[in-house]
Amino acid sequence: MAYPHQLGFQDATSPIMEELLSFHDHTLMIVFLISSLVLYLISLMLTTKLTHTSTMDAQEVETVWTILPAIILIMIALPSLRILYMMDEINNPLLTVKTMGHQWYWTYEYTDYEELNFDSYMVPTTDLNPGELRLLEVDNRVVLPMETPIRMLISSEDVLHSWTVPSMGLKTDAIPGRLNQATLTSSRPGLFYGQCSEICGSNHSFMPIVIEMVPLKSFENWTTSMT
């Protein structure tokens, strides 16, 4: 859950997001070390008049500043590729949900259940109850079982949209005529908020996403009440 003046990421609620946070810290450490070294060398050049004449045209120095950046790039690329393939891998999902973007609301269809589909609109500010979040609440939440591999099929019926839930590390484009897929697994119950992340018209900022993760038994009871 996000909070005012937040500088960092939201708490991870999926294995993919946990991997992304680790990769962010890994990359940030490398950037910090490189920046510190560069700033140190610049300050040294500005505060001293020493010149290393023996290294002005040295084959060893040129070799080092060629090989070292290559090693650093490999250290960044390998974990990045690993996460990329993890995000694309979908093995035996137990539930499939089809998401369609519209101007300016979402439609959800649970393909494993007959006639289980609904539209999800933002709750107007005037209709909010105490404690509810402005521009983030919807009339119909996406209820999903926790600790279950779920496949999301995402598309659009009009213009480009983007189905995004930051705490789950999800951001998938909804493109007319194309069906994209994403996988999600939540490690804990709760409400997780997102929004359309592709400018799609005048009401682009009024397309919130609310995922309610519940235990499997509660999900079964919900599907029974909806069908």
From Swiss-Prot:
All ranges on the Mitochondrial matrix side of the membrane: 46-59
Compartment(s): Mitochondrion inner membrane
Cofactors that this protein relies on: Cu cation
Iron-sulfur among keywords: no
Catalytic activity: 4 Fe(II)-[cytochrome c] + O2 + 8 H(+)(in) = 4 Fe(III)-[cytochrome c] + 2 H2O + 4 H(+)(out)
EC number, UniProt record: 7.1.1.9
Mitochondrial intermembrane side: 1-14, 88-227
Residues given in the record as Cu cation A1 binding sites: 161, 196, 200, 207
Family that this chain belongs to: Belongs to the cytochrome c oxidase subunit 2 family.
NCBIfam families: CoxB (TIGR02866)
Role according to the record: Component of the cytochrome c oxidase, the last enzyme in the mitochondrial electron transport chain which drives oxidative phosphorylation. The respiratory chain contains 3 multisubunit complexes succinate dehydrogenase (complex II, CII), ubiquinol-cytochrome c oxidoreductase (cytochrome b-c1 complex, complex III, CIII) and cytochrome c oxidase (complex IV, CIV), that cooperate to transfer electrons derived from NADH and succinate to molecular oxygen, creating an electrochemical gradient over the inner membrane that drives transmembrane transport and the ATP synthase.
Record's protein name: Cytochrome c oxidase subunit 2
Species the sequence originates in: Georychus capensis (Cape mole rat)
